[in-house]
């Protein structure tokens, strides 16, 4: 349990905090000073596109081609985080962090150019129904109207190493809007070990981890569903189900009939062509399968090289594999016209508002708070506040300076019950021993 204290903030301290605090964004695991990362390709010098002009979900698949979309870059603004950029552009957290390995995920520097990996190689699988590639943490839904093939793609959260998402053929057996979560006994046992007692069922609402929509598969108790933890999309964070952003699961739910086939594959190396250019997209494979997957890739590329009568740049292949940035990269040896053939990334304007970015309510004098941390490093404090801010459901948090330290304060909360529940969640989810701060009764 978290420590409960009668510590209180005075009226003057709260006023000082209101002036001194600066709101920041999400969780962190990077250097205190991020380094500018050059995109792995030249940026096309066109006028900057409006962000609505860049497609992120729906594409037409040209006959005989395997690559969709177009990479882009966007400049970071103050208080941005990569997870918020990722959600706005329908990317997963691992996708955007892998594409920008030297950019601080949670406290990037204003002015940095961030790669948006909005180009994808389709999985090597039948283009029918729903196909999910676990390695890229991405779902593809195919639709054919008799004359053309279209694909809609979304990032997904997948199972952990302990409870992985299974591969294989399945299909949708039923659909549910505002589903009730029937808590599996294994999950209840895991939570019980951490002091979190779950009910047998969780009704629809903000505490339901299934979100607002669910597609039930015929295999075991696996689902494709929404979430109340959007910052987990693009991570290995589920108990085996496939998890989508709330806005994406609604679109998928509306567009997916019962009996739709679902194929789940695990393909870390994707090879495809568009406009005569051969691309390789690499995602880090599991350690035990890395050598085998690399051998399969090289065998496939040697066959393509022989059939195309065009040399592959094997040094580039090695670089793409090693970096595993999840971005399609041309791998034919350079020749006249090669650069013109490859899809050029474009610069996109920064959105006025990032969709889904957590909002932090104003401080209230007579509210309850939780002191989550008191640290000497400003960046560390900002990261922690950001992590807390992106819990699901959200726990609002902010940082303000006190003497030579930085305090991370969660709140405001309406009453002691809310504050104590937030402190409990901080302990269970983040192993933070928070201190509940009562309102100043004299203020």
Regions found by a protein language model. Give the residues of each.
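Cell wall/extracellular polymer interaction/catalysis modules
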Residues: 92-94, 98, 109-113, 117-169, ...
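LysM (lysin motif) carbohydrate-binding repeats in extracellular/periplasmic proteins that recognize
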Residues: 32-33, 37, 77-107, 149-152, ...
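Extracytoplasmic
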Residues: 352-365, 376-443
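Bacterial N-terminal signal peptides
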Residues: 17-26
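Primarily N-terminal secretory
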Residues: 2-8, 29-76, 106-120, 295, ...
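Short, surface-exposed ligand-recognition loops at beta-strand->loop->(often short) alpha-helix junctions
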Residues: 288, 371-380
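Primarily a LysM-type cell-wall glycan-binding module
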Residues: 55-90, 375, 400, 404
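Exported/periplasmic cell-wall-interacting domains
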Residues: 38-40, 187-346
């Amino acid at each position: 349990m978290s420590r409960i204290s009668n510590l209180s903030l005075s009226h003057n301290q709260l006023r000082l905090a209101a002036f001194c605090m600066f709101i920041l964004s999400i969780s962190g695991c990077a250097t205190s000073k991020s380094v500018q990362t050059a995109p792995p390709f030249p940026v096309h010098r066109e006028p900057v596109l409006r962000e609505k002009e860049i497609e992120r979900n729906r594409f037409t698949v040209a006959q005989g081609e395997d690559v969709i979309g177009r990479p882009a870059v966007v400049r970071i603004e103050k208080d941005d985080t990569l997870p918020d950029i990722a959600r706005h552009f329908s990317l997963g957290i691992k996708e955007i962090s892998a594409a920008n390995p030297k950019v601080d995920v949670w406290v990037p520097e204003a002015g940095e150019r961030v790669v948006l990996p909005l180009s994808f190689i389709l999985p090597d699988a039948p283009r029918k129904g729903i196909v999910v590639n676990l390695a890229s943490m991405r779902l593809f839904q195919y639709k054919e109207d008799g004359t053309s093939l279209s694909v809609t793609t979304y990032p997904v959260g997948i199972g952990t190493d302990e409870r992985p998402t299974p591969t294989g053929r399945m299909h949708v057996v039923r659909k549910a809007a505002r589903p009730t979560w029937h808590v599996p006994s294994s999950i209840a046992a895991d939570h019980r070990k951490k002091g979190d007692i779950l009910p047998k069922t969780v009704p629809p609402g903000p505490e339901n981890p299934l979100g607002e929509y669910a597609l039930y598969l015929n295999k075991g108790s696996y689902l494709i569903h929404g979430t109340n933890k959007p910052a987990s999309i693009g991570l290995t964070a589920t108990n085996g189900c496939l998890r989508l952003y709330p806005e994406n699961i609604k679109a998928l739910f509306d567009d997916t009939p019962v009996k739709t086939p679902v194929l789940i594959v695990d393909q870390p190396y994707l090879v495809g062509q568009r406009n005569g250019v051969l691309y390789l997209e690499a995602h880090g494979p599991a350690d035990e399968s890395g050598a085998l997957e690399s051998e399969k890739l090289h065998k496939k590329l040697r066959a393509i090289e022989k059939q195309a009568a065009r040399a592959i740049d094997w040094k580039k292949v090695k670089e793409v594999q090693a970096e595993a940035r999840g971005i399609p990269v041309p791998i034919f040896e350079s020749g006249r016209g090669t650069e013109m053939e490859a899809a050029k990334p474009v610069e996109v304007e920064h959105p006025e508002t990032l969709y889904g970015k957590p909002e932090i309510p104003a401080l209230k004098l007579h509210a309850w708070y939780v002191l989550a941390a008191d640290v000497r490093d400003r960046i560390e404090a900002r990261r922690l506040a950001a992590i807390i801010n992106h819990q699901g459901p959200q726990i609002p948090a902010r940082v303000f300076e006190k003497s030579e330290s930085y305090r991370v304060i969660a709140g405001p909360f309406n009453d002691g019950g809310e504050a104590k529940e937030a402190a409990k969640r901080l302990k269970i989810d983040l192993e933070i021993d928070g201190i509940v701060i009562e309102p100043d009764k004299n203020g």
